[in-house]
Amino acid sequence: KNFHSTAVSDEAKANALTLSKKTRIIPNFIVINENISFIPNNNFLFIGRNENRKNLKLFINLSKSIDETREFIAITNKISNDDLIKYLIDISDDEKNSIIKNVGFFIAPQTHSESFGITILEAINAGNIAICSNLTAFIDLLGDSGIYFENDNLQSLLKVLNKLNNSDLDKIWNQQYEHIDKNYNSQKVLDDWIYVYNNL
């Protein structure tokens, strides 16, 4: 009772210096797409700024290590010197939403300083399987439904992708989708906020 502050995740709470001891975790939310299914495209998507911690470099190295029939798309703020990636620079939300529905796999290779991961939820909600570095924030976000590789480790990522080649991808995506529907749907998060306001 009498919560004085909120945070979107345990990781955000741990990194904050000004929160009171009475802090409730209330995550970000998304509007769940109820008319979506796994997209059986074997392409890869990265979303994030072209800066070290977002680790576009690993995504580029992945593109050099995989069958050339796969398409690699990066929605980012500046182009790197690599012709295997299709770069989409500072596109609109509508353009992003159109692209994200036609990929298959979302790669989240960030190396540090992540407190949540809303783009991961958006990707799953658009019919993609999310494959994430094993940051605490991402493990907290997806729990047992997540597909993880060792932080900044290309060989670990390739091993995970190779294992997925022999897996039931529909089942994996459904587990991720059900997880985000249960934990991050707008009504659930709204109920959490109402609870906090009622306990001020």
Regions picked out by a protein language model, each given a short descriptive name:
Residues 111, 128, 132-142, 151-152:
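Short glycine-rich donor-binding/catalytic loop of glycosyltransferases
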Residues 74-98, 105:
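Nucleotide-activated donor-binding/catalytic signature segment of Leloir-type glycosyltransferases, i.e.
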